[in-house]
């Protein structure tokens, strides 16, 4: 049996954690202060950067506001000390069985795990970090970060924009970094017919949207330009970025102006999903209701709002999570609600109902390895078919799923971690399952989305990449979540330097090439030959985006039956 700590260390690689680093000494000068309409916000300074962490952007979603859309702040909060550790929203703590310790043992003594602390329902806050020299007249571009964590974990506690801001300052193309806290798990993405009827679905997405509206109202006071916002996310955060493009049928405006002008998606894009009141959603809802002791209540949803915090937390966490055998067949995720998310994201994309903004989107080479470690009883092709039929795609027949599985050779040398021959075969179908999960949720879904985007909006620039710099890591390869450490500058090297430079160019100019220092290859638009920028360990190169073409074709032609 795995301990909770071991599971947490694993999920640290899944992108909810960044390394712990020694905090820089606070500069001895007057604390930076920003006057908002509803509060005086006091921050801290270090390394020429002012940080304001834990600024409330919504009323606390507690009591009668639990499981309700976020509400703007209406009163005066007085002085807000935005200098400590922001409270995390309630987390979905998971258990995972049967993963050999030696796979992740090397991570235990490295600084890849930082425990999320101080969690609670009063968690809707936002972080702002800016160059100390920025004034309301600076009009700096803004990078708006949405964390990942499978819609179950994550917090702004774990992400710091210092490395990105320092690089931007050194290159005289300053940016402001913003990170938003949003509700996760059953607090933010509870499905069910009662939830839909109440208008309380996809609360985590609505939290993010209110955070963007807060930026539109307030970021100028910190030196930012509300008309130059790029939204960026990883994993569930990247899926959220896509959903922010798709909310309200692609209307991303607030008071007549766009909330963002560009988008960056690391390891995530479109996730076809059944409605919030689908049978699977009802099963999740009824399980939570039962565990909370609300099954006999006249109004079950009202009962869920009235139980104490610990009771609801335990009930919300009683369903399968991402580290369980179910893997990425998530209990909690954005689902069509007929209101904010009017249809499955894939259908909105095909209908052209998306915010039309330039974007960067990419993946790690081995996205599926971390999600395939526990299914060691899957040893045959039929086992694979049964697994996807039982846990994932209830709208597909076994014959259709067998056809999908057959597009992946029953040959370890063709599986993930890719390009490793017959090595790293943890159990008989491990590399095949890892290849499929990585493609279905991330890599080939990205390609299908890009095909749609470029057919619907050929004038909109799109850029795509593949990270392969962790190729030598046994069992995992360049796994899901490894890009977080690279993007935030915690693993110095050519990949980190490259990604930060290209992203800073995009945030400033909506073009990853404009302003990027000499020596970096030109990143072509994806429409120009369907080429990926390949971030390798010691160099960058271009790679044709045509691998696993038969599988990609099947996915594109059968998206309607491959809903989670």
Swiss-Prot record:
EC number: 3.1.1.3
Subcellular location: Secreted
Active-site residues, as the UniProt record annotates them: 235 (acyl-ester intermediate)
One GO term of the biological process aspect: lipid metabolic process
Transmembrane segments: none
PROSITE patterns linked to this entry: CARBOXYLESTERASE_B_1
Keywords for this protein: Disulfide bond, Glycoprotein, Hydrolase, Lipid metabolism, Secreted, Signal
Catalytic activity reported: a triacylglycerol + H2O = a diacylglycerol + a fatty acid + H(+)
Listed GO CC annotations: extracellular region
Protein name: Probable secreted lipase ARB_02369
């Amino acid at each position: 049996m795995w301990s909770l700590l071991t599971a947490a260390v694993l999920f640290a690689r899944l992108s909810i954690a960044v390394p712990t680093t020694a905090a820089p000494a606070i500069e001895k000068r007057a604390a930076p202060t920003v006057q908002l309409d509803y509060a005086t916000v006091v921050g801290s300074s270090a390394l020429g950067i002012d940080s304001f962490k834990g600024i409330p952007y919504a009323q606390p979603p507690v009591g009668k506001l639990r499981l309700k859309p976020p509400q703007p702040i209406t009163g005066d909060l007085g002085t807000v000390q935005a200098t400590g550790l922001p409270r995390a929203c309630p987390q979905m703590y998971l258990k995972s069985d049967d993963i050999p310790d030696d796979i992740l043992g090397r991570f235990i003594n490295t600084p890849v795990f930082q425990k999320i602390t101080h969690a609670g329902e009063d968690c809707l806050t936002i972080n702002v970090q800016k160059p100390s020299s920025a004034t309301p007249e600076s009009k700096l571009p803004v990078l708006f970060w949405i964390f990942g964590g499978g819609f179950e974990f994550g917090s702004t506690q774990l992400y710091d924009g210092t490395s990105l801001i320092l690089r931007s300052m050194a290159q005289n193309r300053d940016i402001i970094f913003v990170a938003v806290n949003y509700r996760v798990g059953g607090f933010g993405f509870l499905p069910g017919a009662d939830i839909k009827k109440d208008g309380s679905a996809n609360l985590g997405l609505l939290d993010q949207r209110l955070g963007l509206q807060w930026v539109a109202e307030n970021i100028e006071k910190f030196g930012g330009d509300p008309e130059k916002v790029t939204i960026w996310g990883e994993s569930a955060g990247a899926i959220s970025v896509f959903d922010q493009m798709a909310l309200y049928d692609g209307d991303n405006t607030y008071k007549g102006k766009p909330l963002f002008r560009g988008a960056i998606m690391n390891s995530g894009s479109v996730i076809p999903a059944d409605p919030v009141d689908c049978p699977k959603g009802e099963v999740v809802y009824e399980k939570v209701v039962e565990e909370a002791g609300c099954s006999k209540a006249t109004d079950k949803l009202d009962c869920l709002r009235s139980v104490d915090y610990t009771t609801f937390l335990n009930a919300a966490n009683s369903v399968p999570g991402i580290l369980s055998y179910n893997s990425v067949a998530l209990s909690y995720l954005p689902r069509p609600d007929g209101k904010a998310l009017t249809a499955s994201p894939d259908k909105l994309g095909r209908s052209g109902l998306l915010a039309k903004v330039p974007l960067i989107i990419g993946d790690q080479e081995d996205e599926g390895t971390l999600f395939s470690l526990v299914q060691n009883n899957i040893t045959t092709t039929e086992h694979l078919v049964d697994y996807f039929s039982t846990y994932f795609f209830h709208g597909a027949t076994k014959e259709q799923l067998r056809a999908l599985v057959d597009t992946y050779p029953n040959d370890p040398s063709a599986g993930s971690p890719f390009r490793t021959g017959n090595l790293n075969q943890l159990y008989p179908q491990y590399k095949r399952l890892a290849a499929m999960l990585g493609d279905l949720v991330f890599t080939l879904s990205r390609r299908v989305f890009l095909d749609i985007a470029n057919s619907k909006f050929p004038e909109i620039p799109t850029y795509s990449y593949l990270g392969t710099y962790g190729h030598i890591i046994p069992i995992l390869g360049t796994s899901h979540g490894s890009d977080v450490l690279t993007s935030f500058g915690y693993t110095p090297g050519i990949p980190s330097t490259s990604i930060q430079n290209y992203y800073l160019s995009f945030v400033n100019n909506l073009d990853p090439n404009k302003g990027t220092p000499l020596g970096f290859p030109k990143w072509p638009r994806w429409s120009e030959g369907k080429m990926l920028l390949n971030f390798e360990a010691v160099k960058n190169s271009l790679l044709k985006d045509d691998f696993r073409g038969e599988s990609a074709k099947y996915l594109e032609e059968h998206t309607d039956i491959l809903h989670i």
